[in-house]
Amino acid sequence: MPLEDAQNVTAARKELNKLVQERDENRLRPVGLSPLFQDYAQVYLDRLSTSGKKSDTVVTERTHVNRWSKAVGHLRIAKLRPHHITGHLHGLRKAQKSARTCNLSLTVLRNILKSARIDGHLKTSPAEGLEWFKTEKKAHRLYSPDEIDRLCKAALARRYVEGRLAKAGEKGARLKNGVQFVDYLRFLQYCGAREQEALRVRVADVDMERGHVMIGAEGDSKNREARAVDLNSQLRQLLEDMAKRRAPDSQWLFPSPQRGEKDEAAKTFRESLKLAREAAELPDFGFHDLRRFFASRAVMSGIDFLCVSRWLGHKDGGILLGKSYAHLANEHRKTQAARLIFSPVILQTDKASNS
């Protein structure tokens, strides 16, 4: 085993003593050349495709692995140092990437290095001890029913030309998938499903007789468990209306408009959302805001946290709901505050009322 830092006899003895200590502690460094990072990254990607992780997770990890390969792919994996890692992460920040994106990138790198350590290419990870980027916890805005209606109305308006808003004097047209897009918005609004969960719902997952829709019936929800969302009156009406116009050749509740002969679910409605929210002047509106809307309205309706958390797919009995989703509208808080009574009151009994 080479004595890497030995420039003289004293340094050689010091390095030798260090190696003896590492041997005694069973943490000797691997002998021989480690693979280039870019080569090992490909090994990791090959394993990732058969890891059982959800497709969305695989796509995200692949993006970050490719970024790391471009940044440090020329280095042998055992030569990767903390300054290489922090240099790339700070480069992402300079490129206006969010702190969350940088933290996700670091998580993916740690996954790669953990795999390399298991394979014997590393004894310790150079990413150990690196600090996470601090993320700002912003208060989420609660959109009103009128604002959601405005978004849906904008999605069906004749205001679009070649993937953008029509300019003054231009003749606009509707979004090609406008009706389906609005159905999707309403579905999220009335059942609280996550963006990707809703896209994977099949027609067979809707049980009108039993009065529920299954989210993640194939184990493809966020927590990999199926859950039943009971039909409220608006969700039932929406699903009945959708059934009248659904594509007879597709098993999906939201089939892809470009599926051709292959039956595929729609992959995303994000481009439609960008256009509709611009037209509705709701620039920060996101699909997850509809999940927050559902949770908040359910809580304001007096439904207990445990029931709502089950509809949302939480497994903590409502703790996260209380922290993250119970955003009560201003008028509701004021109404509840008006009901507070601090002075003594005389309650009328049934006997007194009948006399």
Which positions does each model-derived feature cover?
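Short, polar N-cap/turn motifs at the start of nucleic acid-interacting alpha helices
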Residues: D205-H212, D284, I303-S324, K334, ...
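C-terminal catalytic core of Y-nucleophile DNA break-rejoin enzymes
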Residues: D220-D241, S250-K274, G286
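N-terminal DNA-binding module of tyrosine recombinases/phage integrases
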Residues: M1-T86
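C-terminal secondary-structure termini that scaffold catalytic or DNA-interacting sites
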Residues: K153-R174, R210, L235, D241-P248, ...
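C-terminal catalytic core of tyrosine-transesterase DNA break-rejoin enzymes
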Residues: I118, R186-E197, R291-K315, E331
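Basic, Lys/Arg- and aromatic-enriched nucleic-acid-binding interface segment
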Residues: C102-S105, I118, L122-K123, E128-E195, ...
